[in-house]
């Protein structure tokens, strides 16, 4: 029983090691860079212009084979994850508002797009990128998201996003200019923790079949070894003959044990080389008595008292 336990413990150690490696590989890009929002809430009066800003933080690879895809879209606050829904901004989708730039190139959207829809996207070399909205209306209120996708060799490697809310007010309670509220560190930590938890769950689900397969292989090997040990022990037991029992042919498939009768031994006199045995001679001291003889020798009578008269 000790061998299977050791094998199972080893399999679980290997499974934990594989899970840790996959988790580190999957969460490595999460810690590489992220998107920060300097302001989480913008409150602006109707008809005003506003610029929503996001900032790319962390080490960013500036190789020629790396491209960053940046864009904007509207969304709604979900119960599980923010920015999961992608809605257009003033009838422009996130494909229309995207920015492509490499490590040594900045990009701006065309001036015609800004004039037609009152929008303009911009980015710089310091990781800041923004979208400017002119002539705000009440319909512009809502949640806005910025998205950054890292593309290596024409394949998407990693994507991060940030969220902020825009409130357009009218009337006496509306401010004269836009008022911005900075983001709290707790919100950023919650977003990062949620991203890490989601990545860990996904990697765990992907690694679970591999871990189960490894455990199954180890248990199968342990079962085969146990079966071989049992067969070897059975062969050794069958090779030793029991002197008290003899296996008889089975009757109707049920083996029976046949009892051997104990061997009887009768002591007999073995003849000597001369053909006669000492005990067979009648005159020997240890020979059995003949017919009419007494085994013990007879003794002469002893007088009761000495004759004192004869001196």
Swiss-Prot record:
Positions in the Extracellular compartment: 33-194
GO MF, one example: enzyme binding
Disulfide-bonded cysteines: 54-146
PTM (free text): At the cell surface, may be cleaved by MMP14.
Glycosylation sites noted in the Swiss-Prot or TrEMBL record: 49, 91, 128
Disordered: annotated span: 267-311
Topology of this chain in the membrane: Single-pass type I membrane protein
Record-level GO cellular component terms: plasma membrane
Any single Pfam family the record assigns to this protein: V-set
Name of the featured protein: V-type immunoglobulin domain-containing suppressor of T-cell activation
Organism of origin: Homo sapiens
